[in-house]
Amino acid sequence: MLRAGRIQKLTVSRISDYGLYLADEEQNEVLLPNRYISLTDKPGDEKEVFLYHDSEDRLVATTETPLLRVGEAGYLRVVDKTAHGAFLDWGLYGKDLFLPNRNQQGGIIAGRSYIVYLYEDSVTGRCVATTKLKRFINNDLISVKPRQEVALLVASESEIGFRVIVENRHWGMLYRNQLFRPIAVGD
C-alpha cells in the first residue's frame, strides 16, 4: 500500500517521459520524477523512496531523505507563514511541510525553528505537522526499559533541566546537574 510520509521499497514498473513509475506489491503506482532517476534504472529494479503529496495533491516519490517521517518529532525551521498556516523546511527539494493554524500552539514566526510532530491526516492522507504534541507524545504506555539506550529530542528548557521527547513517543527529563555537555532545544 502506498502511503505518504514513509520510506518504501518499490519496483520500477515502467519508464515514461516524466520519470519512472514505481509499483508496490499490489501494483499501485507512483511517479518518481526524472530529477531523481539514473540512466541505469530499468523495469524490475527496486528503489527505496520517500512518498509525499505534491502541490496538486498527487502522491509522488523522491529519493531524497526528509528530516522527518510520519510518527517522528523534530526541530524544523519556518520558511513561510500565510493566513492558513506555516510552511516548514523538512529537507525535500521544492516541497515544504504544512503546519495548519489549527495545529499551532502559540505564535509561529517565519525564520524561527519549532518542535513539531509529523502525522498523516486521516481525511486527506497528507503529511501534516503540529506543535500540539500532547496527542502524540505521552507516558500512558511506556515502551522503553530502564537503562535502555534511546533517541532523544530536546523539546524545552526549564529551571531544573530540559524536557525531552524519548523515542518519538514519551516525555522525559534531563536534569541540569546530570548533564555532561551543553545541550539546547532541538538537539
What are the residue ranges of the model-derived segments?
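Single-stranded RNA-binding regions, centering on S1/OB-family and related RNA-binding modules
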Residues: 1-187
